[in-house]
Amino acid sequence: DIRMYKADGSTFVKKARLRRFQTSRDWNHPTTFVKAKLYKKYPFRNKGIHDDYGFFLQMQSQKRKIVIVDQILANFHMGGASNHKDLGAAVKRIRDRYRYCYRINGYSRWYMIECVAIEAAKFILG
């Protein structure tokens, strides 16, 4: 889990989850630990902000063991590259997440809806 700090100083805890319907909302990249041998065996793209999530989905599709620890492992301040409010940047994030996370790992085209919904929520909720 990860403690998220908003710009106004308030916090909330974002819980990590494993569900049948995968979404980046359930994964907390700052709290992910991966064995070096997996990085060597499955090198990932490393060219965009969603490539680590693509790696996570690849590990899941390869039936690698994923463990969720019910404990806060990091504190995180919101407002990074994935939250930049720019329509062009949002369209690129939608395209990249869909292409390099979901489609490359064999997920349904329906995941485009999830990608659009995430970016729309960022614009609306801040």
For each predicted feature, which ranges?
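A transmembrane-helix-recognition feature enriched in membrane-embedded lipid enzymes
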Residues: 102-126
